[in-house]
Amino acid sequence: MEDAKWWNVFPLSPGLLPKFLLFVSVVSVANSMQCYATLKFTKRVYSGKPFEVNGLSSRTFGTWTLLAALVRFYAAYNISNGAVYDICTGTFILAGWHFFSEWLYFGTAHIGEGLTGPLIAATTGFFWMVSQRDYYLALPAQ
């Protein structure tokens, strides 16, 4: 039996995409916790109209983010499962739609420290997953 190593917690599938999914999942869990603890960081994301951020909207956003984290975490370890892969891709589509619409249509978000990270994660995740779909779905199940 191979010695247990701390890095064995990382997804075994080749490439960086599964590790990226694990990373954004962990970051999203941390973001979800802060959404329940304080409005400070949620108001940074929605800096265009911070007065619209309240406890309920922050907790709802935290719950939505936690659900996306769960899907992305599962996909990190099941990257060759087509249904899981597609649902995970959908989380990036929804996140991108949300953040871009809050910025460009509703005006509740402005480009800055609160919005830049989520926009980068959503667009990077989406384009990476779309471009690598055939490769990862051709892998044997882990």
Feature map (PLM): residue ranges:
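Core segments of alpha-helical transmembrane spans in multipass integral membrane proteins
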Residues: F23-V29, N54-Y77, I93
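Juxtamembrane interfacial secondary-structure elements that flank transmembrane helices
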Residues: M33-V45, L70, S80-A83, H110, ...
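Juxtamembrane helix-loop boundaries in multi-pass membrane proteins
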Residues: P50-W64, C88, G114-P118
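Hydrophobic alpha-helical membrane segments
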Residues: T65, D86-E102
